[in-house]
């Protein structure tokens, strides 16, 4: 599933940009919790960054570096290929801000700021996507294959006994 790949690679890029060596965190969906969560510990995003990156197709902050995976400005919108909304939690300079990215009635992507509060959490971004019950196992099997290729393996939560396939890392 593209959403898992795109947001996980964006999280890896956020760590690369910020010089962070810790793994990204991924919570896989299960029948008990129908949410996919991908959390990075990069620099976080300001409100202006959120609007520019998530609301406009082709907008990318990564074109000036060859060390980053993404550069086309499409991956941050990939959740719209799966559903009509998703949540963005940005942890930026001591503030957690929650946004809802959604497709409006005219089929245009919009960003709504839902809440903002002081936070002691480390900077970064968390993407939360509601998942169909029938897709839970597909996300788990996709994660097993995808994350095998990551040099720094993500911390995976949400499922018991998660194991990676054995292959040579690409990222």
Residue ranges of each PLM-predicted region?
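A broad, low-specificity signal for short, low-complexity segments enriched in glycine/proline
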Residues: 1, 46-51, 88-92
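Solvent-exposed, well-ordered amphipathic alpha-helical segments
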Residues: 8, 12, 32-37, 85, ...
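Alpha-helical scaffold elements adjacent to nucleotide-binding pockets in ATP/GTP-utilizing enzyme cores
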Residues: 7, 49-56, 81-82, 142-146
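Conserved beta-strand-loop-beta-strand hairpin that lines the nucleotide-binding pocket
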Residues: 12-65, 99, 105-107
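Hydrophobic (often cysteine-bearing) scaffold residues that line and stabilize catalytic clefts
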Residues: 4, 46, 139
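Conserved ATP-binding N-box helix of the HATPase_c
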Residues: 1-25, 75-82
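GHKL-type ATPase core
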Residues: 65-169
């Amino acid at each position: 599933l593209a959403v898992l790949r795109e947001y996980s690679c964006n999280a890896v890029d956020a760590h690369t940009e910020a010089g962070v060596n810790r793994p990204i965190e991924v919570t896989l969906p299960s029948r008990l919790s129908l949410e996919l969560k991908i959390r990075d510990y990069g620099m976080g995003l300001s409100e202006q960054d959120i609007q520019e990156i998530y609301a406009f197709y082709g907008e990318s902050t990564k074109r000036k570096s060859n060390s980053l995976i993404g550069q086309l400005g499409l991956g941050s919108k990939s959740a719209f290929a799966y559903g009509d909304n998703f949540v963005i939690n940005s942890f930026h300079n001591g503030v957690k801000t929650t946004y809802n990215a959604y497709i409006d009635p005219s089929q245009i992507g919009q960003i709504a700021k839902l809440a903002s509060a002081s936070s002691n959490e480390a900077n970064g971004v968390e993407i939360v996507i509601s998942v169909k019950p029938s897709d839970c196992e597909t996300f788990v099997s996709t994660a097993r294959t995808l994350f095998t290729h990551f040099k720094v393996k993500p911390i995976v939560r949400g499922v018991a006994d998660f194991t990676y396939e054995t292959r040579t890392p690409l990222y």
